[in-house]
A protein has these predicted regions:
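Immediate flanking context of iron-sulfur cluster ligation sites
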Residues: 16-17, 21-35, 54-57, 120-121
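C-terminal TM-helix exit segments that contain a strictly Trp-centered aromatic cap at the helix terminus
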Residues: 23-28, 80-95
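Extracytosolic (periplasmic/ER-lumenal) interhelical loops and adjacent juxtamembrane/interface segments
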Residues: 93-137
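A hydrophobic membrane-anchoring alpha-helix module
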Residues: 121-164
Length: 164
């Protein structure tokens, strides 16, 4: 079976990540008026990082060693994304009595706390992350984002293993 070129696959992944961010901001934030929680913001940052890695890989279009480096970076980001999606799904599965308290808006976090304290708070999530505000076919938003990360991961592994 002939696979599309390395460059085309990376461009498609970069476009896919751009599409995901556009849907998140355009539809969920602007149309449905859903404010992203801390873990949602981290997942968006990971999607943007994957898109940037894939775009750089497409522009650079390296030989085999470079392809493996870019694919490895992409796979590492996928693992990070799956971790944070899983963490949010775990928070959503907690009984109400175990859900952490809600935190303050991100804008205020960086005003009040040091950068390291604010980032630590972002990475832990809060009660807002446990709230299920949207579902499709029984799967909440972090579940669908995890599906996207798994898709990016499969493509990253194929890109890593393919011959130059």
């Amino acid at each position: 079976m002939n696979l599309p070129s390395y460059r085309i696959v990376n461009l498609a992944q970069a476009f896919g990540s751009l599409l995901l961010i556009t849907i998140a901001v355009g539809y969920f934030e602007n149309s449905l008026k859903l404010e992203p929680c801390y873990l949602c913001m981290i997942q968006r940052a990971v999607i943007i990082a994957i898109g940037m890695i894939c775009l750089l890989a497409a522009v650079h279009n390296p030989r085999r060693f470079g392809q493996r480096v870019y694919s490895s970076l992409s796979i590492i980001m996928v693992i990070v994304g799956i971790y944070f999606s899983g963490k949010q799904l775990w928070l959503q599965s907690l009984p109400e009595s175990k859900v952490p308290s809600c935190g303050m808006p991100v804008e205020h976090l960086f005003d009040i706390f040091s950068i390291t304290e604010a980032i630590t708070m972002l990475l832990h999530g809060d009660g807002n992350c446990a709230e299920v505000r949207w579902q499709l076919m029984g799967l909440s938003m972090p579940g669908w984002v995890m599906v996207c990360f798994v898709g990016f991961g499969i493509i990253g592994i194929i890109q890593f293993l393919r011959k130059a």
